[in-house]
Amino acid sequence: SGPFKVKEYKEGESITYERYDDYYRGKASLDQVIIKIMPDQSAQEAALQSGELSVMRVTSQTKLDKYKKDDNYTVYNIPEGRLNYLAFNYQSEIMKNEDARKAICLALNDDEIVEGAYGSEELAKPAKNFCSPENLYYNDEMKGYQQNIEEAKKLAKSSGLSGKTLHYIYFQQRPNMKETAQIVQQQLKKIDVNLEIEGMDGSAFFPHLFAAWI
């Protein structure tokens, strides 16, 4: 269904796609595309600078600013349509309480998360509903929660959330997730909620997130 098809997959190393000549919108201009699997961002940069890589995803404001100033590179802003979100575990007794969930939402500041974890809205934008702002079905009329610490404290106290310690897991291979978790941790401290944060690789994170909760 796309302009390329899988030619070779080397686990943990690379995926090679070759052109699919029968693509209904016509042949692609490239014969093949090789995607290198490089979890280490320093290795990515070294490969880009040596010419081993033609394209690299930039996930930090510092690197974005650096490459924008360097005439040897061209920076493209391509919306991913990806949505990063906080999911509540409804099997947890405290998370079954709607006021506890509201308290958490009211304690968070999306703008601070974007600024602290990404650097600016050049790399991420706050989403106020369950679609990214680039999605066709994004609803501008939905405003989401606005940070209100005093109201969050009241709800946290009345729901029994105050003084609790919550366990927060994140996918550690995905950029900016650790920084996001740390900012959320600091914001929840303002309403007397402690957060234990734990990064997991894919083999642990996804089974824990989906299979373990069902």
What does each model-found stretch correspond to?
Residues 1-28, 32, 150:
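Gly/Pro-rich hinge or "lid" segments in bacterial periplasmic/extracellular proteins
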Residues 2-5, 15-16, 31-37, 163-172, ...:
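Short, well-ordered beta-strand elements
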Residues 4, 124-158, 174-177:
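Structural transition elements
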Residues 11, 153, 157-214:
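Ligand/substrate-recognition segments at binding pockets and active sites
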Residues 20-66, 194:
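Ligand-site clamp/hinge motif
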Residues 65-77, 212-214:
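Ligand-binding "clamshell"
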Residues 74-88, 91, 95-134, 179:
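Periplasmic-binding protein-like
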